[in-house]
């Protein structure tokens, strides 16, 4: 019919810019032993929402994750939100998560676990001149604070709404999350590639790719039908796409797709890619 069935507003009268970003997932999940179709979303304000897809009702209370929340207004307030607030209340104030999140990238879901990434990143809100229709007018500006910036990845048990584990990352994280066969794949803005155990968060592999990671790792087959892990990095440096080979799984062993042991062995190829990349950069700069 084209008519709205339901809606759920995460942050009424949002003055911090903490909307859900690219993170909405529709999937079947097990809740209290019963399979149910759910909607999962995370916001730039570092809250995760798990909703009944049929009704829009919350299955769990909003799940808070990430670093501390400072000068944040109207998150999870519903009809109790202060609709008279203006952005004047945060002028000359530092607020966290900042204007860019928080959780601002694509999340992932597998084996009843929701994986979300959060940037521990604050911004300051000030008044100033901004360009509007080729003219300078009075407006608001966002400034980056001088504090160290880091990130964290969180695994949330969808059946309970509890955080299973948290993995800290030393730099900002703007790429999406990929999960396959019990392995979580990440690449941060400093170019570090990670493979984590999806159940425990244990690091299976960490490889420097020497370029900013701003996109999710992709798993697909090449023209020959061989499975590959594709890692894109670049930023201000020359960009590359590294194609990493996956191991052939012996059918006599457990049939879990990409085995962790095989993963660790196969990703040795990445070291070769990294060395060749460094040689290329040195040659290019000279």
Placement of each model-derived feature along the sequence:
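Sequence-pattern detector for short linear motifs
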Residues: 231, 263-264, 285
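C-terminal membrane-anchoring or membrane-association module
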Residues: 273-286
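Juxtamembrane/start-of-transmembrane alpha-helix segments at the extracytoplasmic/lumenal side
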Residues: 253-269
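Short, aromatic- and cysteine-enriched interfacial helices/patches
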Residues: 240, 258-259, 284
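Small side chains
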Residues: 155, 195, 262-265, 274
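Extracytoplasmic/lumenal domain signature
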Residues: 1-20, 25-37, 41-103, 108-174, ...
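S-adenosyl-L-methionine-dependent nucleic acid methyltransferase catalytic domains
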Residues: 59, 271-272
């Amino acid at each position: 019919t084209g008519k709205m069935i339901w809606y759920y507003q995460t942050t009424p009268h949002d003055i911090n810019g903490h909307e859900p970003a690219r993170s909405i997932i529709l999937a079947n999940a097990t809740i209290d032993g019963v399979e149910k179709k759910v909607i999962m979303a995370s916001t730039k304000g570092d809250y995760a929402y798990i909703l009944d897809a049929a009704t829009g009702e919350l299955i769990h209370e909003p799940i808070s994750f990430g670093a501390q929340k400072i000068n944040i207004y109207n998150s999870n307030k519903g009809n109790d939100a202060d609709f008279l607030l203006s952005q004047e209340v945060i002028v000359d104030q530092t607020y966290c998560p900042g204007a860019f999140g928080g959780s601002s990238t694509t999340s992932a879901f597998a084996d009843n676990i929701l994986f979300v990434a959060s940037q521990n990143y604050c911004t300051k809100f000030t008044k100033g001149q901004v360009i509007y229709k080729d003219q300078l007018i009075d407006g608001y500006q966002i400034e980056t604070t001088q504090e160290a910036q880091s990130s964290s990845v969180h695994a949330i048990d969808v059946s309970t709404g509890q955080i299973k584990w948290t993995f800290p990352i030393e730099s900002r994280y703007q790429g999406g999350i990929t999960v396959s066969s019990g392995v979580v794949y990440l690449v941060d803005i400093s170019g570090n590639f990670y493979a984590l155990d999806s159940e425990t968060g244990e690091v299976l592999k960490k490889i420097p790719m020497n370029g900013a990671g701003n996109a999710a790792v992709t798993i697909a087959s090449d023209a020959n039908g061989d499975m590959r892990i594709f890692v894109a990095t670049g930023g201000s440096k020359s960009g590359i796409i590294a194609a990493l080979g996956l191991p052939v799984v012996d059918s006599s062993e457990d049939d879990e797709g990409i085995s962790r042991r095989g993963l660790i062995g196969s990703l040795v190829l990445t070291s070769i890619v990294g060395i060749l990349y460094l040689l290329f950069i040195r040659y290019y700069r000279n």
